[in-house]
Design a protein with these regions (language model features):
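A short C-terminal helix-loop "cap" of Rossmann-like NAD(P)-dependent dehydrogenase/epimerase domains
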Residues: 48-54, 166-169, 193-204, 230, ...
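Glycine/proline-rich active-site loop of Rossmann-fold NAD(P)-dependent oxidoreductases
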Residues: 153, 178-191, 198-203, 217-218, ...
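Conserved C-terminal active-site "lid" loop/helix of NAD(P)H-dependent oxidoreductases
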Residues: 217, 237, 272-296, 307
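Short, hydrophobic alpha-helical segments
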Residues: 228-232, 259, 312-316
Length: 326
């Protein structure tokens, strides 16, 4: 049985990826961030029937020795561990360099030394910056509009360099905005939903005019797995996108209509990005992933939102809807 290491397994997308890999018959080694509480993030909420196929490795992606130890005995690595909050990257950019760039280098170097069969490095649509044309394909230029996106550009280019320099069998997976159950309330869809479910009538947001291309998390993780299964994807960088966009304002209107029609949106200054840092439009092309793999999105936006709302209704005790957390 193939064993796959998932870094960032304790996070939002990572925990869903662990779940789906087990469902598809893989053994999983889950790299989770060490903490003194002995908790495994969202993996603590997965079923016992899933977790019996999961081996936990507690460590820190910034430590090359621990990373290499974690990678022993696996055939493939799905590298998702990263710092992703854009506002926090304004606050602590050095930490983003250490985690996102050095952490990725640790994975690539260990994979090279251990002859790992496949490496998937997780990128982000933020590397493109505001769209210069749409739909955004993989040839679109990069623009570091935040310290976060700059570190992800750096990590991507390191991955490319290991493919070109050492023939490391790496693929760069570039999801557009992913949403779904277990997502942090820092993200826009959960922040709207949790505020609405808390009963307040004023929903605090930043800019309402940017557009985003939203992937439901189950489609995102299936994109990862289909890229892994395709040898044609080696050495490639590949978008996961729906080719549909919606403004943040329209998204808020839709969720307000579904949950609390009496609510309204107010713009809160602390939630605004600096003007030159705001990515105003993201609409991705999924032509390449469809050409190189068997991936097709299975969820409509309406279906994904319904499942997401249902999760938050049942788990509001896990969130602090009254606080803005960068």
């Amino acid at each position: 049985m193939v064993k796959i290491l998932v870094t960032g397994a304790d996070g939002f997308i990572g925990s869903h990826l662990v779940e789906e890999l087990v469902n598809q018959g893989y053994q999983v080694k889950a790299f989770v961030y060490y903490n003194s509480f002995g908790t495994w993030g969202w993996l603590d909420y997965l079923s016992e029937s899933t977790m019996k196929y999961v081996e936990i490795f507690q460590g820190d992606i910034r430590d090359p020795h621990g990373v290499k130890e974690a990678m022993k005995g696996v055939q493939a690595v799905f590298h998702l561990a990263a710092l992703i909050a854009i506002p926090y990257s304004y606050h602590s950019p050095d930490t983003y360099v250490d985690t996102n760039i050095k952490g990725t280098l640790n994975i690539l170097q260990a994979a090279r030394e251990l002859d790992i069969n496949r490496v998937l490095v997780t990128s982000t649509s933020e590397v493109y910056g505001t769209a210069k044309y749409v739909p955004i394909d993989e040839l679109h230029p990069f623009q570091g509009q935040s310290p976060y996106s700059a570190t992800k550009i750096g990590a991507d280019r390191l991955a490319e360099s290991f493919y070109r320099s050492f023939s490391l069998p790496v693929s760069i997976v570039r999801p557009f905005n992913t949403y779904g159950p277990r997502q942090s309330a820092r993200a826009v869809i959960p922040t709207i939903i949790t505020q609405l479910l808390s009963g307040v009538n004023e929903i605090k947001l930043g800019s309402l005019t940017p557009t985003r291309d939203f992937n439901y998390v189950k489609d995102t993780v299936n994109g990862f797995i289909e890229i892994y299964k395709s040898d044609r994807a080696i050495g490639e960088e590949i978008n996961i996108a729906t080719q549909r966009e919606i403004t943040i304002g329209k998204l808020a209107e839709e969720l307000i209509h579904q949950i609390n029609p009496a609510a309204c949106v107010v713009c809160e200054e602390q939630r605004l990005r600096p003007v030159k840092s705001e990515v105003n439009r993201l609409l991705g092309s999924n032509k390449k992933i469809k050409e190189l793999t068997n991936w097709e999105p299975q969820y409509t936006f309406e279906q994904g939102l319904a499942e997401t709302i249902e999760f938050f209704k049942k788990n509001m005790n896990l969130y602090k809807a009254d606080r803005y957390n960068i």
